[in-house]
């Protein structure tokens, strides 16, 4: 079990459009993620620690590949046009999480610029598993020199919302591939994994946090596992892992800290206290503190 908390830095504020008396973070100052680092297992004599200093927040590269042309003919994707970073944090089954993260990384590292069919020419970004017009048409089509011009056609193609959709797709594909081995409710519970995405939108330059909660439902074809995506508002936190145990208290600390200039610090201090005082062997030190603001990332640790 794990405790992960993610929130927006509180350096700048704007008026809440739904309240004339409240200010909320402007979501332009970066995000922070806190995670314990203990991996434990249940034994006949109780829960025992297996590994400490386990990474539960992973930096994932986002690469958009641009099309290469020989004269007016498409000739594959040979060069990365744009790179960005995001954080993926997980709580739950480490095996399922590794499968999910591999799937997310595989998708986000192979995004490709394509064109949308229609009257007006328009470039779009596609997942590697999407239908791709350039690849489909191959060298049978000719493209004029006035299109696929990076300076005018490749700007503002990658949004945080698009990345969040790719992550959602990747999680669901990973869960779907594991369901063939799930034979009973115990096996289903064992694969439960929740995910947090933190990314600064390359277009808006605003910060976005998303939480993906593990869910399942019964259909005519059996049980389906999937993720339920939620956008985290400016004055909220994303909490996964031992949310049912510590979530309420952490949210109370966060609410009280909104009016201070020590929002991240107060939350970090309280989370550290929770981890230090936990006697279940489900969470443990050190605590990783990671931040992301655009493509700038930092990390530090609380070891005692």
PLM features: residue spans?
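N-terminal nucleophile
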Residues: 1-304
């Amino acid at each position: 079990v794990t405790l992960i908390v993610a929130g927006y830095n509180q350096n700048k504020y704007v008026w809440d459009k739904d309240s004339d008396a409240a200010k909320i973070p402007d979501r332009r100052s970066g995000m922070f993620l806190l995670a314990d680092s203990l991996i434990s297992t249940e034994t006949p004599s109780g829960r025992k620690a297996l590994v400490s200093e386990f990474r539960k927040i992973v930096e994932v590269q986002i690469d958009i590949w641009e099309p290469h042309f020989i004269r007016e003919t498409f000739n594959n994707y040979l060069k990365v046009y744009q790179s960005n970073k995001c954080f993926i944090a997980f709580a739950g089954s480490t095996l399922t999480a590794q499968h999910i993260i591999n799937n997310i990384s595989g998708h986000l590292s192979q995004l490709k610029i394509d064109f949308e069919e229609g009257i007006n020419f328009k470039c779009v970004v596609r997942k590697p598993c999407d239908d791709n017009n350039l690849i489909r048409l191959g060298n049978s089509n000719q493209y004029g020199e006035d299109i696929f011009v990076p300076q005018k056609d490749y700007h503002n193609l990658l949004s945080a919302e698009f990345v969040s959709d790719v992550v959602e797709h990747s999680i669901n594909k990973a869960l779907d591939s594991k369901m063939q081995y799930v034979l009973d409710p115990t096996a289903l519970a064992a694969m439960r994994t929740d995910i947090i995405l933190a990314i600064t939108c390359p277009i808006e330059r605003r910060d976005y946090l998303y939480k993906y909660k593990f869910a399942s439902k019964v259909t005519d074809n059996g049980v389906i596992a999937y993720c339920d995506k939620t956008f985290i508002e400016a004055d909220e936190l994303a909490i996964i892992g031992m949310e049912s145990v510590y979530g309420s208290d952490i949210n109370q600390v966060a609410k009280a800290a909104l009016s201070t200039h020590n929002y991240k610090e107060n939350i970090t201090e309280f989370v550290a206290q929770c981890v230090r005082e936990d006697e279940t062997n489900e969470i443990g030190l050190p605590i990783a503190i990671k931040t992301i603001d655009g493509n700038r990332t930092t990390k530090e640790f609380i070891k005692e």
